[in-house]
Curated annotation (Swiss-Prot):
This protein's name: NADH-ubiquinone oxidoreductase chain 1
InterPro entries listed in its UniProt record: NADH_UbQ_OxRdtase_su1/FPO, NADH_UbQ_OxRdtase_su1_CS
Role noted for this protein: Core subunit of the mitochondrial membrane respiratory chain NADH dehydrogenase (Complex I) that is believed to belong to the minimal assembly required for catalysis. Complex I functions in the transfer of electrons from NADH to the respiratory chain. The immediate electron acceptor for the enzyme is believed to be ubiquinone.
Gene Ontology biological process terms in this record: aerobic respiration
Gene: ND1
Record family assignment: Belongs to the complex I subunit 1 family.
Length: 290
């Protein structure tokens, strides 16, 4: 029991420390893509910039909107972070105190539930920008989650089990590019960052949050980014830390290179392009592997 608690705490420490440094890594990559240096003043080459930014955020005052439910407003960011944290337990590489036989099904439940935290956070903030961002996130999730579930079902058919594990198979490379599009949509990253949409919605669903609540939302967002980089490494390339950071770099460069889609084009892309392709992949694995 004590060993299990120690491993759970170590996973949380690992995730939070990783988030601190991948955010710094992202800011340097975005700076390089725009021909500027990026953060380089705090300590050696800005190495501790993310830690000082976190301390500064924690010192800010948390303001609750006048007509908002204070309890819901405070609880939602914590639930958002917990959902992200639970996602790490579907990958059997960071702990050894249990065997998760149906980790893929548990993962589908988590990503289905995660959109509710975004939706509720926008609703309880009583802000028109937050509300529009929440509605966008919910309709966006309906668009990609069906295709995403079918892709994972095709992978289940291929590996003949409901548990994530590390393997390397060339036949799954055809699924990688569509999977990348759906990961971008799940993470609300450009070009599918409609829930935030800085140029349209100020900051979207988290526009009213500050201090600890914003830190939890931030940790949840970037923790999910790091998790999906790890998941992609596990599914398509074998578990490798090099592949994890290569995948993270790809996600950052997509943000710096591509503008935001039009909302109707995003819906059309997932419903009429990726969904039929996912059905084709599923039919292929069912017919030729069984």
């Amino acid at each position: 029991m004590i060993l299990m608690l120690v491993q759970v705490i170590l996973i949380m420490i690992f995730v939070i420390q990783s988030i601190a440094f991948v955010t710094l890594y992202e800011r340097h990559l975005l700076g390089g893509s725009q021909q500027r240096i990026g953060p380089n003043k705090v300590s050696f080459m800005g190495f501790l910039q993310a830690i000082f930014d976190g301390v500064k955020l924690l010192k800010k005052e948390q303001m609750t909107p006048l007509n908002s439910s204070e309890i819901s407003f405070i609880l939602v960011p914590g639930i958002f972070f917990i959902v992200m944290y639970l996602e790490w337990f579907v990958l059997p590489f960071f702990y050894d105190f249990m065997t998760f036989e149906y980790s893929i099904l548990f993962f589908l439940c988590l990503i289905g539930f995660s959109v509710y935290t975004t939706l509720v956070s926008g609703m309880v903030s009583k802000s028109k920008y937050g509300m529009v961002g929440a509605i966008r996130a919910s309709s966006q999730s309906v668009s990609y989650e069906i295709a995403f579930s079918l892709y994972l079902l095709a992978i289940v058919m291929h590996i003949n089990m409901f548990c994530f594990f590390s393997f390397f198979n060339l036949s799954l490379f055809i699924v990688y590019l569509p999977f990348l599009f759906m990961v971008l949509a799940e993470l609300n990253r450009a070009p599918f960052d409609f829930a935030e949409g800085e140029s349209e919605l100020v900051s979207g669903y988290n526009v009213e949050y500050s201090s600890v609540a914003f830190v939890l939302l931030f940790l949840g967002e970037y923790g999910a980014l790091l998790f999906f980089s790890t998941l992609t490494s596990v599914l398509f390339f074998g578990f490798s830390y090099v592949v994890i950071y290569c995948m993270f770099t790809i996600l950052v460069f997509v943000r710096s290179s591509y503008p935001r889609f039009r909302y109707d084009l995003m819906m059309y892309f997932f419903w009429f392009k990726l969904l039929p392709v996912s059905l084709i992949f599923l039919g292929y694995f069912v017919i030729f592997l069984f």
